[in-house]
């Protein structure tokens, strides 16, 4: 085991040696099928396993108000099986799903008809003319009965069972603002199973246990709310963004009860089409191996109308914004955010370097100013740190003493203003570039994380953007970062949040 660890460390050390440090050549081979399906392969001859991923270009950006979290919910539903996987008697179950669809359509019609009576009119969610109608109660009872009958005919976790039975490991799924992905690591001779299951999931998913699965999201949301910082971070997201869906969390309490099979089916049928899908394989396969196999399972799918593009766009930055957050459970802090561009914009790679170079420097400045606290600089919104649309860079300072909030904010703002006028020491920038380069080469030797980065860049912009993105980080200078700060770290693009104990006066 010690020898293996030594060899692994040696491999990374060799990868980041100066002789090859700036070589980001990614041997990605691509084939685009007639129906628009994109296949990306990195061939690693001799490897006996294959990392397999399927990315769909859809996520929270594509949701509508009142349905926040619906994309994440769709991911859960797509684990419930298909017409061929997950049923003990599909013909009988099929009839129940048809009845469920009809009952839900009638329920939606009744909810719409009663919209004025049911509308929530209270700021504190405390006033409706009526909470229900007899017709609504009857339809919900019918849906519950049909659900129970259908559930008796379903099998739990059918797709997972098949993957595990044939040597699959690391089965995961993720839905974020811009993508949904499913992935698995399989033995070389079982890769065809991935194609069989994912093609079936893409065309024939059955939304079993719909209402029971809804409660899983409720539990996840409650888990998020148990973390003291969750609501503050969400409030900061809302402060920064007024129009972009990138800042919206995975559903509020009211959203979970609004999800309908009709809306989930609309998302599914709109976005899960071959011309909105990318397959990625890294391991002991070749492009020539994969092309006929992919054609076998996905080739019959028709190219469908292009899914509607995301049109949300933030207004131009025009004013400083501020949030005072009262909490006795969350540590006092100051957080300053600035909107930054999305991947594909030439400025975006520089923010990675700026964050890495400026964090340690800012920590030293804060300490020298007599402020006790910890600095963290990141570009995270909800769970993700890069987007194809504008998001934010977040300068966070968690304090030991709430009485230092004013002093801490002043020190932060002064140093941010200085950053736009005076370049950082060149050695800090060089160190940041080396740090990012090391992180990348650790990614490059791990097929799972490498495949994710390729897929993520494809949905944000293009997989071809990844290599120049890395090269741009390597070329960043202290003057580049000074110009970047001068352009973006301005008052009209600034959102400031402070966390105060509840007893501290205004």
Model-assigned labels for residue ranges:
Residues 68-76, 80, 356:
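Active-site recognition of the HExxH zinc-binding catalytic motif
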Residues 42, 47-63, 69-73, 85-200, ...:
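M16 family metallopeptidases and their MPP-like homologs
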């Amino acid at each position: 085991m010690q020898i293996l660890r030594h060899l692994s460390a040696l491999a990374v050390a060799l990868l980041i040696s100066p002789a090859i440090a700036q070589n980001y050549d990614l041997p990605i081979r691509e084939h685009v099928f007639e129906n628009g399906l994109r296949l990306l392969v990195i061939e690693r001859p001799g490897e006996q396993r294959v990392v397999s991923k399927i990315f769909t270009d859809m996520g929270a950006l594509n949701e509508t108000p009142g349905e926040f979290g619906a994309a994440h919910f769709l991911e859960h539903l797509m684990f419930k099986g298909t017409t061929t996987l997950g049923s003990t008697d599909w013909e009988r179950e099929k009839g129940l799903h048809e009845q469920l669809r009809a009952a839900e359509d009638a329920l939606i019609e009744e909810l719409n008809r009663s919209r004025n009576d049911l509308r929530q009119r209270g700021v504190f969610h405390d006033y409706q003319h009526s909470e229900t109608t007899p017709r609504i109660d009857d339809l919900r009872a019918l849906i519950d009965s049909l659900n129970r009958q259908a559930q008796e005919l379903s099998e739990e976790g059918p797709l997972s069972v098949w993957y595990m039975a044939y040597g699959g490991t690391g089965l995961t799924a993720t839905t974020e603002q811009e993508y949904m992905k499913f992935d698995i690591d399989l033995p070389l001779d079982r890769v065809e199973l991935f194609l069989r299951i994912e093609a079936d999931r893409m065309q024939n998913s059955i939304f079993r246990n719909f209402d029971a699965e809804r409660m899983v999201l409720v539990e996840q949301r409650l888990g998020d709310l148990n973390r003291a910082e969750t609501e503050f971070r969400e409030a900061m997201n809302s402060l920064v963004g007024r129009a972009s869906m990138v800042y919206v969390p995975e559903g509020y309490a009211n959203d979970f009860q609004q999800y309908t099979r009709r809306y989930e089916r609309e998302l599914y049928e709109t976005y899960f089409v071959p011309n909105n899908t990318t397959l990625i394989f890294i391991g002991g396969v070749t492009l020539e191996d994969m092309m006929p196999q992919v054609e076998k399972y996905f080739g019959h799918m028709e190219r469908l109308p292009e899914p509607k593009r995301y049109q949300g766009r933030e207004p131009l930055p025009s004013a400083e914004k501020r949030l005072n957050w009262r909490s006795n459970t969350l540590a006092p802090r100051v957080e300053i955010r600035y909107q930054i561009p999305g991947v594909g914009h030439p400025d975006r790679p520089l923010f990675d370097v700026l964050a890495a170079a400026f964090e340690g420097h800012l920590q030293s400045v804060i300490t020298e100013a007599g402020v006790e606290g910890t600095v963290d600089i990141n570009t995270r919104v909800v769970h993700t740190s890069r987007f194809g649309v504008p998001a934010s860079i977040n300068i966070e300072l968690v304090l030991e003493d709430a009485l230092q909030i004013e002093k801490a904010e002043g020190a932060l703002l002064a140093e941010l203003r200085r950053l736009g006028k005076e370049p950082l020491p060149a050695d800090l920038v060089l160190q940041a570039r080396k740090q990012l380069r090391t992180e990348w080469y650790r990614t490059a030797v791990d097929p799972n994380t490498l495949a994710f980065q390729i897929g993520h860049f494809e949905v944000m912009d293009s997989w071809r953007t990844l290599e120049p993105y890395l090269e741009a980080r390597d070329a960043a200078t202290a003057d580049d970062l000074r110009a970047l700060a001068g352009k973006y770290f301005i008052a009209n693009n600034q959102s400031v949040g402070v966390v105060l104990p509840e007893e501290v006066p205004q």
